[in-house]
């Protein structure tokens, strides 16, 4: 690469050795997961190519929704269907809460917009729902874990074997706390997160795997809830990130909210009814506005019709593409600020960008495409990859790299999104690792004491670009004590920052005089889940998995019994089957047993799977001997299936 930083070739070699040494111990399949705000996607690298996997409905993206209704947990497509019926019991957009504090400005805003209850649990936002008439709270990590578990199940269904390892993507501008919280979610889901990679970097892998000549690309990743921009240079299998910027609280959900606010005001003006007081009405509107937004990517006008949005009132309004663009114009243009920032950080002119790669469902919006094209002086963005699947595709490639799946020559060099440093006297932010430094990386700096005979130093670690620590984000702190008495400035305290391949920071301080040291892994600052909390959440997740399994078994057993009842009815009453061949007494015996079973089924809706299976056996014990007796008769029937035999397809 012409612009490659001087030390990069050495780093590439060490990275290759690092990857082969660390990742060679990983066994079994490794899947790639795009854990999105609104939708998630999973892929796997198999037989030399990436497969993006379908969910149970045949869709390649799955809603990041979890619902708790009538004691039953649903995840994905089924959960999203509950949103309009049970808005306070359906959880979504949890990516906007994960790794944040309860009083964060963005969380405060979301609390007023989301229909479910968000409560304060030791300074962290937790979600409160009712399960079996009891209030139950979940950390955002637990809800994300349920979505990850769903992705794992989709992969296991495709591969036909257990999956324990995954590469998971996060927004490039996720801070340390949000990254660690995402790893915790993976642990709760029973996954070993072998790598966390940035979403635009994953998309670049998807776009540029076959690129041999040096190519500079700008990845513009606008999803449902987050926005990232990265500049990368791809050269013969080496993917080097030069700069990254973004906004972890900007995306399609915000565009929807602008439209919703517009229609809420209009409805109140016409009907003197505030829809905000009715959570079900808001969810109905949210659903239709999202559909309208998608439609406006291909048409210029669409009608929104909601019958009985509130009692006695229908909703019928037209939304034009022009109005949608007007309502969101400032948000659309806000996305250009990170674009300008990465160009400045990478010291790139617009003309030096070879390709603009659009990623994320929101980049389908025509106005977004127009704004980007105009900003780059008429250059057409590349539309060669599926914006919904590109990130999962890249994550699957990274998974293949880790397993050594014909991708040994691909090297990924990502960067730190924010500057890392410590507080020194006067509240100064002393930088150790600057933003856009290639990772993994390590940096040491020597400090000293401020006062004579100072016995300890407090190491406070911050993240951000401001000169004073009060304007930056505190990641964590620890104390190094036992410093021998000495004059101010004499003790030598070496502070070492190490950022690993997942972008997670480790900090160590050592008194060079005594050799005494202390360190911490900076994770989710004071809000990080403890080991005990994670263990409990793993147990809770297993309990939910058991409950889901029991529910599936119950539904299956109930269906088997009901199918057998209907089959026996048809068998003895249909002239094409046994009606003309069976003796009257035998027919009455079967019909009587069938009626008893039907009545029992109607009166025992809460029966467990074992009781249902036993009832089926009891019914079979009455019916089967009669059916078998007829097999030997001339012109006798074909054998009837028992209730627990496999049939060609499940009933809907």
UniProtKB/Swiss-Prot annotation:
Residues 643-652 have a biased composition (Acidic residues). Coiled coil: none annotated. This is Endoplasmic reticulum chaperone BIP. It is found in: Endoplasmic reticulum. Endoplasmic reticulum chaperone that plays a key role in protein folding and quality control in the endoplasmic reticulum lumen. Involved in the correct folding of proteins and degradation of misfolded proteins. Acts as a key repressor of the unfolded protein response (UPR). It holds the Pfam family HSP70. The keyword Signal applies.
